Amino acid sequence: MKKVYDVIVIGAGHAGIEAALAAARMGKSTLLTTLEKAGVALMPCNPAIGGTAKGHLVREVDALGGQMGLSADEALLQIKMLNRGKGPAVFSLRGQADKALYHDVMLRVLENQKNLDVLYDETTKILVKDGVAHGITTLENGEIEGRAVVIATGVYLNGRTIIGAETNSSGPVGFKNATHLTDNLLSLGIDIRRFKTGTPARIAKDSIDYDEMEVQEGESDIGTFSFMNDGNLYSQMPCWLTYTNEKTHEIIRKNIKRSPLYNGTIHGIGPRYCPSIEDKVMRFPDKTRHQIFVEPEGRDSDLMYIQGMSSSLPKDVQEEMYHSIKGLTHARFIRYAYAIEYDCINPLELSSSLQVKRIKGLYSAGQINGSSGYEEAAAQGLMAGINAALYVDEKPPFTLNRDEAYIGVLIDDLVTKGTNEPYRMMTARAEYRLRLRQDNADLRLTEKGFALGLATEERLKKMQERREEIERIVRLSETVKIKKENGGIFERYEGVQVEKTMPVKEALKHPGITFDVLKEVTNAFSEFSKSALFSAEVMIKYAGYLEKEDAAIRDARRLEEKILPEDIDYNALSGLRIEARQKLSKIRPATLGQASRISGVSPADITVLLIYLKTAK
């Protein structure tokens, strides 16, 4: 191939797809390379998009002009709002997706995207000259020139699947793995480590006793992922809930020496927040049962995904423990659970733009950066694709702060703190989560996406109309009154007596009073959409907390605005402790704010850096 591309993306999983689409939509000639067509947008583990904090990421990717939310909506089987009892900051959409349909939808999007070519071939080498990436070498097509390269190889680098004593050199689901690129990355001086993840068995749907399980229905009035879609999902498929029991746990304990996780076969580090069933049983011996969700893999699929039963135990043990569970007594295995080990890079090698610090024009996104999850991958892929396109145009990188998006928290955590295990996004990681709700992702990010040339004019207009609608609701809430004679709603929904007339805005400060409740006493808000009413209600109800968050954000930004020179010699700053010098020299933070978040850098060290910046002027 002789064509010179602006951007080359390696890997067509959730990160690679977003990276390639972002670059192409920003007008860059883009090549997406991947091992095989069947692996495009593959969902090798759970048949779901979203979840706690992950739903926020999907909404943010969508708000910026990414693809995951739109494609997920086309493939939805069921959708739910998680964390309803914990407050609006952590409300998170989670949708069951038809795996085959999601693959088909993404393939169609890629094939129809202007400026984008797709090549099915293995990348063996990143071409680098004088510290600058300038293309790739592939197994069958040789050298391909490119001005920027994005690595998004997922779990395919030297992938090895493990079931008991059986090990296979392969990617997920028995797909081909990539066996050449790791050596090239090592030769470029990039720090490589070995991580592990796993997946449960897939069971034939006609072999499950559903009557012995608890049915789990979706919700049909909560909208979907993309801000571009206004409707609800009415035709939904159920999931089911069952539990492990003492017999299950005894089978696991009896066979624990045959577990690759416990007998030394597996060397990779696994995810803390998605442990295998044997790990859960051994780590939490006091728990008498663990939740197991049985989820469909597609409308026309014969496979059911057994969430919560990830394992690498031998096949005979898997059959015994699955058959001990209510509803799975006659379960027929289509695919056994397995663990997979893979190579990934130390994310401390990256800057906040996801560019490899030592190689200009080389970016990295997704599970190769040590993260886990489809949504975390998509978010990184989008940002890497944006920044690769900006790099080609010789424009400054685009980054998001921790107070602007969960995407900002995710990337800052990876490149500042690093990770010793597969990193999972959680709401607890975000300091400003009341400001970073999933319902306002469009208000926070769509203008930024439009300025980049990524979000469309139609998307921008839709966001502006929704923002104006929210502002009208807030203004109206100041003038519409709840009359004294309607005070009974406070007694019904709060158990308190209120005997005075008050504006709706004041009434909403009461925890039990919502716009939904207020329908009983006023129709002044009947013209407004449910999503706008929810966003306005949160703004009104939590105004005091939001003001406190804004003050904290202003304080944090003072440190973020203080830029640290790239060539600063930390070893020459005598006031810094040895650990701080070592960490600062390795990570080379861009700002004082980033430096303050590095493990091992104390407030006293930050004071030393502040003094240095003042005297250096």
Where are these regions (language model features)?
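Beta1/beta-strand and adjacent pyrophosphate-binding region of the FAD-binding site
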Residues: 2-15
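Conserved N-terminal/central alpha/beta ligand/cofactor-binding core
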Residues: 4, 21-125, 140, 152-172, ...
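Short hydrophobic core segments
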Residues: 10, 143-154
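An anion/pyrophosphate-binding glycine-rich loop and adjacent beta-alpha core
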Residues: 36-38, 182-319, 416-511
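Conserved beta-strand-loop-beta-strand element in the redox core of flavoprotein oxidoreductases
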Residues: 127-143
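A glycine-rich dinucleotide-binding beta-alpha-beta segment and adjacent secondary-structure elements
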Residues: 305-371, 399-412, 529-583, 588
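Internal hydrophobic alpha-helix adjacent to the cofactor/substrate pocket in enzyme cavities
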Residues: 377-398
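Extended, charge-enriched "interface" segments that sit outside catalytic cores
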Residues: 429, 446-605, 611-617
